[in-house]
Amino acid sequence: MTQDKPSCLLTCEVLWDCFPDRELLGGATLNVAYHLHQLETRSILLSSVGRDRLGELALRQIRDEWGCDTRFIRTLDDAPTGTVTVTLDDRGEPSYEVGTPAAWDQIDIPAEAAAMRPEAFVFGSVALRSGHNRRSFADFLESYDGLRCFDANLRPPHNSVEMVLEWARRADFLKMNGEELDVLGRAAGCGDGDPESKLNALAGMSGVNTICVTRAEEPAVMLWQGAVFHGETFPVEVVDAVGGGDAFFASMIDSLLHPPFDPAGALRRATALGSWVVSRRGAQPPYDGSQPR
């Protein structure tokens, strides 16, 4: 796009985490969109919501509170806005029930969005659970020549290793966590090696030359053009672990879209932002000046 800020087209699972006492807007790629918008990249969202109360609330928050571009979020009459019902047991341990079907199972990529020529396209494996989305994303990727960013989430019951590897081959930049690296590394023929060996095996199988792995308390690692970089940790008091990896992913995308790319610096910046997010309540904390720069 011809504008100062690079733009990013994101396919988002717009959903609500429904707790017994509250409802929180979420979805991994939606969280990425929020953080990109707060950084130096314009977020253009692709999704669907239902014609219901939660759909109206989601659009209002994304558009009016976050300031993101929602023109390509459709409102459907035949499917509800996505939800995840969170139930807490006697010990406070959560269990989750993902609503199916949901409006975000029907994400279209209209010609108007493609014509905007966004510098990056972000998609995640969770949204690939529906055939509609798989067809829509595949059709778009056939002719898209920008940066393709794929978030590999192996979340039961949508945790097909074969499908994740298939879609990883369409990406330029792949993000996952340490557990997912173990699983995908094993599928790539490196089950017992160190992270470097698993990254190289996965790159060899998928053809992706930029892979980032978040590892909770351990430093993140990144493969970039054949070299492996190790991050550092930023000790914080964890208030809410949800969304830290999404902020990390957003920061890495932002760095890739603002050349020249410094892999070590980008890894440090992304780790610092993810650490800051988990020290706050919620996956989309306000950027109030306390965030790392």
Regions inferred by a protein language model and the residue ranges of each:
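Conserved post-catalytic alpha-helical subdomain immediately downstream of the catalytic base
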Residues: 6, 17, 38, 207-210, ...
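Active-site beta-alpha turn of Rossmann-fold NAD(P)-dependent dehydrogenases/reductases
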Residues: 12
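Ribokinase/PfkB-type carbohydrate-kinase core domain
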Residues: 1-9, 70-71, 90-228, 261, ...
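Residues at secondary-structure transition points
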Residues: 23-27, 53, 193, 239, ...
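Substrate-binding N-lobe of the ribokinase-like
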Residues: 8, 17-84, 88-93, 98-104
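Short, basic and Ser/Thr-rich N-terminal targeting/leader segments
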Residues: 79-82, 216, 271
